[in-house]
Every structure is written in C-alpha cells, then in structure tokens.
Amino acid sequence: KVFGRCELAAAMKRHGLDNYRGYSLGNWVCAAKFESNFNSQATNRNTDGSTDYGVLQINSRWWCNDGRTPGSRNLCNIPCSALQSSDITATANCAKKIVSDGNGMNAWVAWRKHCKGTDVRVWIKGCRL
C-alpha cells in the first residue's frame, strides 16, 4: 500500500508515535517519506545480505525475521512480511523498540540526512489529526 501523507500521519498518531521518545509526528512522517516514499511494500537489499522492509525500512539483521538473513536477531519478534502490511501496527511497535535502543531516530539514515534539524511540521501541515 502506498499511503497518502496525511493518511500515514493519522495511522502513526493512532499507534502512539506522536512524541514517542520526544519525536514529534512530523519526524516519523518525514522518515517514512525518505525511507520508502510511504510505500508499505518497499524493500531494499543491503550489502551485508540483510533487507529493509516497509514504510520505515526496518532491517532484517536486527529487527525482523525474513528467513534469509544470516545471524538475524529478530528483536521485534516478527516476520519481516508483517512490516509490509497496510496495517502499520507491527511497524509502529517495532519502531518504538528501535527508537528506544539508544540512538533515537539516528537509527534511520534517511531521517539523519533529510529530516534531522529541519522544520518537520511541514510533513503534517494541512492534515486533520
């Protein structure tokens, strides 16, 4: 599913990401824009053999199990396919675990490159939330 910007913002808010660990909703929407272009089906293979999945491009080496990543830790205890659903419950719950891991949203390269230090309110502008 390719989410609309405000549609994804609303879903993220519903799942408790707004101000989770101090990160406003705009940060999450911005990260999703640059990680996946709001596409829940997005996958990207990494040079280490792991794959990133879903709107927030969550990695199979650490966070989910795709059955093909050597030494996968699966710290969110989910199949990676759950991160590709149109229902973002698994993505939101796993993202909360990731952002609590010590580096905050710096865990997302796209967030560091495109969102960090910017006015992320633009990402929820005009949305009825």
From Swiss-Prot:
Q: What is its main location?
A: secreted
Locate the active site. E35, D52
What Pfam families has UniProt attached to this entry?
A: Lys (PF00062)
* Subcellular location, record wording: Secreted
Task: Please give the biological process terms from Gene Ontology that the record holds.
Answer: defense response to Gram-negative bacterium; defense response to Gram-positive bacterium; killing of cells of another organism
Q: What is its EC number?
A: 3.2.1.17
Q: What superkingdom heads the lineage?
A: Eukaryota
According to the entry, every stretch annotated as the C-type lysozyme domain falls at 1-129
SMART domains with a match to the protein in the record: LYZ1 (SM00263)
* Disulphide connectivity of cysteines: C6-C127, C30-C115, C64-C80, C76-C94
GO cellular component terms, semicolon-separated: extracellular region
Gene Ontology MF term list: lysozyme activity
Which EC class is the enzyme in?
A: hydrolase
Concerning InterPro entries, the annotation shows: Glyco_hydro_22, Glyco_hydro_22_CS, Glyco_hydro_22_lys, Lysozyme-like_dom_sf
Q: Which reaction does it catalyse?
A: Hydrolysis of (1->4)-beta-linkages between N-acetylmuramic acid and N-acetyl-D-glucosamine residues in a peptidoglycan and between N-acetyl-D-glucosamine residues in chitodextrins
Question: Which of UniProt's keywords are assigned here?
Answer: Antimicrobial, Bacteriolytic enzyme, Disulfide bond, Glycosidase, Hydrolase, Secreted
Anything else known: Lysozyme C is capable of both hydrolysis and transglycosylation; it also shows a slight esterase activity. It acts rapidly on both peptide-substituted and unsubstituted peptidoglycan, and slowly on chitin oligosaccharides.
Functional note: Lysozymes have primarily a bacteriolytic function; those in tissues and body fluids are associated with the monocyte-macrophage system and enhance the activity of immunoagents.
Q: Which family does it belong to?
A: Belongs to the glycosyl hydrolase 22 family.
Q: How does it assemble?
A: Monomer.
Name assigned to this protein: Lysozyme C
